[in-house]
Amino acid sequence: MVLGIGMSRRRWALSASVALVAILVAGGAQAQSLSDSVRMTVQTNPKIVSQENNRSEVDSELRRARSLYLPQVDMRASLGPEYTENIFTPPGSNGQHIRQELSAVLTQKLYDGGATTAEVDHQLGRARSAAYRVAENAQYVGLDAVEAHLDVVRLRDVLALADKNVQAHADLVQRVQARSNGGAGTAASLNQALARYEAAQAERDQVRGDLADAEARYLTIVGQAPGTLEDPGVPAGQLPTDLDASIHIMRTNNPVVKAREADIDTAKAAVELADSRFDPKINLEVGGDHNHNVGGVPGRDNEARALVVLQWNLYAGGSDIHNREAAYAQVEQARTERLEALRKSEQDLRQAWAAYEAAEHRVPLLTSAAQHDSEVRTAYSDQYQLSQRSLLDLLDSQNDFFQAEINAENAKSQAVFQAYKILAIQGTLLQALNVPPPPQADPSTPTPRPIRPEGT
């Protein structure tokens, strides 16, 4: 068993040497910053790209609605045999002719009760809502990237601590073996040390598994495997002075709330569209016909016209009334959803602030506790050598020190994450990281016309 420990120590030393060489080789390469991780996520994450495509689709609907202001031109042509027998059929004719028709009509809306304007406003509201949903996904998927980045950094640090913990237990096994060989130790003490050593190895394996999961999640969110990652600190300069200031920023910038406000405008436009159904429709029609052999009459039959046409539905079974009632209900629903989104965002923001302040308070305490545990471990090691402390005391002090280091590391990472979560809920995460939002997140900027997909 002692030989096995010695081999383990040599393997650990070899691994440490390889890791050191890798660090030195990679030293010239710049660590990937948190901003880089979020920027790649915003550019490539499928959730965000899906919302960008939705914005493009809605913008196409907006262009379609605006085209309703323009005139419509229709042409019709026909050619074929016709048999006609009526009072206009010339004597001696068999009533068979080759009928030819050609007509063209230009129709321009003069009045439609505001239906076209309401449809444009409806699609404008949808476009604004779609833009804010792009911004929403960019903020919160960006926050997922922050969490994935921090988790990889944290677990790599924890793995380094676990390696040190395994080595410390290996050293203890060697010391107990040496005492046992000198007649000062027992087989029970050696077994106790070996059990703790193996438990430390198992804990390190667990950390390795957690790190592999974190790296896989990073790959899924960011779109590439994590290399050397920068360990970011708390963005203290980007945070508001207090919770009230943060809530004020959230009410102004949170994209979830702004999307719901756009939904209210969309629903109001639907009410105007429903109201327009009660008004007449007035169109200007300019057209002409160039025909031959129509209605059994041989020869030309030409016609030109310019008409003002009024069309008014006087009764539709009450469907227009029901449409208007449904539109009013949609407005109230949109207002309720906006209030719900605002309350939920404020709740999330308050919880994030509480978690951030708690983590910030815990970091110095846990760091100090780890330092004290380190001093206790050193003192117990000296006392154990003088037989003034038991092996159990020494093993427990090593475990306490290891757990204290992990607790301090976790608290530091949690404080950083909660700070960025505050920024995301405010709607200012990308701005704080100097990451440009997707162009589709700007409601004032129309998206370009989509390219025809391949295979269509």
Residue positions per predicted region:
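Boundary at the C-terminal end of the N-terminal hydrophobic targeting segment
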Residues: 29-33
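Amphipathic alpha-helical coiled-coil scaffold segments and their short linker/junction regions
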Residues: 38-42, 190, 194, 224-287, ...
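Acidic, low-complexity, intrinsically disordered peripheral segments
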Residues: 4, 83, 407-456
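Amphipathic alpha-helical coiled-coil segments
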Residues: 50-65, 137, 141-161, 171, ...
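Transmembrane beta-barrel architecture of outer-membrane proteins
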Residues: 99-101, 147, 192, 281, ...
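Periplasmic alpha-helical coiled-coil/stalk elements that build and connect Gram-negative outer-membrane
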Residues: 2-8, 138-251, 263, 352-355, ...
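Small/polar (Gly/Ser/Thr/Ala-rich) solvent-exposed segments
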Residues: 49, 72-96, 107-138, 258, ...
